[in-house]
């Protein structure tokens, strides 16, 4: 049929074929399509001698099409907006299933196997977009109604974890982005989905709810917005601060300094209390500053990714509560949520910002945050509009509340695929075989192991001695280069062995150290052997570079 349709020079047949094609795209039943196909073949055979019959047939099919359109219009007059959106989405999924049936071959098809050493692109495609069971992948589609039934499912791609494995790649052991689990990556490959689809709405709503569990914040309002972790700074400054508000910034590295820069860009007045690289600000000095001036907010970088220094958040919030209880507490948890224990409500944190690509364990692209009831009240009592459009909670609050209530709302299009991945990861974190408390303990254990191994290799942490006991992150380690060695002696050679570490980042000593990430799936799934691998490879590189333990 498709081959005949390509004969465009046959005017009569082309007209009828176009009508048939339009009927197929519109999803007409198989019986009607078979009739149209028969008409096309008949018209082609009789073209030269039966032009009058051709015109009659064209007229008949056009009349049928008009009648069907009228019927569809009448039936749609009582259809709600949501039902219409669902119908469009279902039609798109049926179309995708049809296309998959024509294009996809099974994984064991020898003609699809990539040459040895080459990434199996087609095989990967078939595993992610596999046609529903029973589809004729070689010789055309099965019954369209079966595809429609499959398309109504709200599940992720039908490929099971046992059949999907991500392509071979270098082991990513930097403090974010991190390694992503196979099931999370597969969820990210979910077919394109309308953000108002009845299938997507509960996925978004449940993801919002699970954020509260991860941060132990039952009373707080979560936000899931397209963007990087840095967007969280903008959200805090745009919604909680107003022009000339004083903010006390506790900084332990590059990201604390950058947060202060962001606050200034929004019209605030940041005062930084910084510490030398590898240490933490003095709490007595912090308390003195709070007594000297009324600050609208205090910002804390829980773990600064540039140094791996861990702030004692409960100690800081206790000082705030006793000295300046009206001051808001804003916590940057980009490099801590998921790998460090957090009790947002109990600690008295008013705004927690983080991202998708670190302890949460999904690809980059989501700015995640939670606001306490006090933070929401502060926003609602502003004397000026929020200093931003995309960042305004006035726009986002109705959206988050709607989806949590299992109804759609719209301000800006959410990244549906990433939210499917987020849902999968959060479900594993909150309902999986490894509990949240066990997850945090596994990160503590892995951190101790890495730091002990570093010491045994004759290396030192960037963290100063007074911070090494309880002031270092459990999801990363910053390591000083041994005497006589530098980045070119370590990082490229690790990459050659299939492991990626991160370079230094602190402005005062970025060339003096490198950073190892150990969080997420690399820690929670010991069967991967990621920690074993990096320690073994690092020792090999050090020996090759001529380093001797002291």
Predicted regions located by residue number:
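Conserved N-terminal alpha-helix of the aminotransferase class I/II PLP-enzyme fold
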Residues: 187-235, 239, 254, 258-264
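PLP-dependent enzyme catalytic core of the Aspartate aminotransferase-like
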Residues: 120, 512-550
């Amino acid at each position: 049929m498709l081959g005949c349709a390509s004969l465009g020079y046959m005017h009569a047949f082309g007209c009828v074929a176009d009508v048939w094609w339009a009927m197929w795209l519109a999803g007409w039943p198989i019986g009607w399509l078979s009739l149209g196909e028969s008409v096309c073949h008949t018209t082609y055979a009789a073209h030269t001698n039966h032009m009058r019959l051709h015109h009659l047939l064209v007229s008949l099919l056009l009349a049928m099409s008009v009648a069907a359109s009228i019927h569809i219009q009448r039936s749609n007059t009582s259809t709600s907006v949501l039902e219409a959106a669902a119908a469009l989405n279902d039609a798109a999924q049926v179309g995708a299933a049809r296309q998959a049936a024509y294009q996809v071959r099974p994984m064991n098809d020898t003609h699809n196997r990539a040459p040895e050493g080459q990434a199996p692109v087609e095989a990967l495609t078939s595993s992610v977009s596999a046609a529903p069971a029973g589809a004729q992948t070689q010789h055309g589609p099965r019954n369209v109604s079966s595809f429609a039934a499959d398309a109504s499912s709200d599940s992720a791609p039908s490929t099971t974890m046992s059949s999907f494995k991500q392509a071979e790649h270098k082991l990513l052991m930097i403090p974010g982005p991190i390694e992503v689990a196979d099931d999370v990556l597969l969820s990210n490959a979910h077919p394109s989905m309308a953000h108002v689809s009845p299938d997507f709405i509960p996925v978004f709503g449940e993801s919002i709810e699970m954020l509260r569990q991860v941060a132990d914040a039952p009373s707080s309002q979560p936000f899931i917005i397209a963007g990087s972790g840095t967007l969280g700074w903008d959200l805090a400054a745009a919604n909680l601060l107003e022009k000339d508000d004083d903010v006390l910034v506790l900084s332990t590295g590059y990201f604390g300094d950058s947060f202060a820069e962001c606050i200034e860009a929004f019209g605030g007045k940041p005062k930084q209390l910084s510490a030398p690289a590898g240490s933490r600000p003095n709490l007595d000095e912090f308390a003195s500053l709070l007594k000297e001036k009324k600050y609208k907010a205090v910002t804390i970088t829980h773990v600064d990714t540039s140094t791996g220094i861990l702030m004692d958040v409960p100690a800081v919030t206790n000082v705030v509560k006793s000295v300046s209880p009206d001051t808001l507490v804003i916590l940057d948890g980009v490099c801590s949520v998921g790998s460090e224990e957090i009790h947002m409500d109990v600690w008295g944190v008013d705004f927690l910002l983080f991202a998708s690509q670190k302890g949460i364990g999904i690809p980059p692209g989501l700015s995640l945050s939670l606001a306490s009831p006090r933070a929401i009240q502060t926003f609602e009592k502003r004397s000026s509009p929020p200093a931003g459009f995309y960042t305004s909670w006035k726009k986002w609050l109705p959206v988050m509340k709607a989806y949590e209530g299992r109804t759609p709302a719209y301000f800006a299009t959410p990244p549906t695929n990433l939210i499917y991945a987020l849902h999968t990861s959060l479900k594993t974190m909150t309902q999986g075989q490894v509990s949240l408390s066990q997850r945090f303990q596994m990160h503590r254990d892995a951190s101790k192991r890495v730091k002990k191994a570093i010491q045994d290799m004759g290396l030192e942490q960037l963290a100063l001695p007074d911070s090494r006991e309880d002031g270092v992150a459990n999801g990363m380690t910053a390591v000083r280069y041994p005497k006589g060695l530098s980045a070119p002696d370590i990082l490229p050679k690790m990459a050659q062995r299939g492991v990626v570490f991160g370079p230094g980042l602190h402005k005062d000593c970025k060339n003096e150290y490198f950073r190892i990430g150990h969080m997420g799936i690399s820690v929670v799934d010991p069967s991967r052997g990621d920690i074993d691998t990096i320690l073994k490879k690092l020792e090999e590189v050090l020996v090759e570079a001529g380093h001797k333990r002291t």
